[in-house]
Amino acid sequence: FGAKYPPDIREGGQWWRLVTAGFLHGGLIHILMNSWSFLTLGALAEEAFGASRMLVIYFCSTVFGFYLSYLGSPALSIGASAAIFGLIGAMIAISIKEPLRYGHMKRTFIGWAMFGVVYLFLNLRIDNYAHFGGLVAGFATAYLAGTPRAEGSFTERLWQFSSWACIVITAASFLKMYLWFSHSTQ
């Protein structure tokens, strides 16, 4: 439907799947686990980075995670885990970049990442490429983003614009998915 599926991305030009795959889930347990993780990490990330930066981190982690998965795995893949790992990477980055304010969290988030890596290799049905890509993208985006500046500054307006661009791209991706699906079922 909108999963990451390399043949459709490569031959069909369906690049929107790199976005939509991050919002689809394979069952109740899958969505509950990712929702719990997002509620926990999302609140911490929003507090640290602000809503605009967090949204950009989430989006970049999703897209880069599924892009790395597209390059490395032929399997069908869905789920918000690439973005969840991106938020873990973001919290590691901020704990390194601002140790006085967030350094006390570093061990916790490195522990989460290590637990995730160990679990990933024990469960062969999990998309390791997407998770690793999300972790790297979240770390890199957060390291570049830093924490919020003065309200109304050029930097803050740029992050707000970027977050709106991510929302528009996500909406356009779902529109493309809908149009593809409605056309392919006729």
Feature locations, PLM:
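A detector for small-residue-rich transmembrane helices and their helix-helix packing motifs
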Residues: 1-186
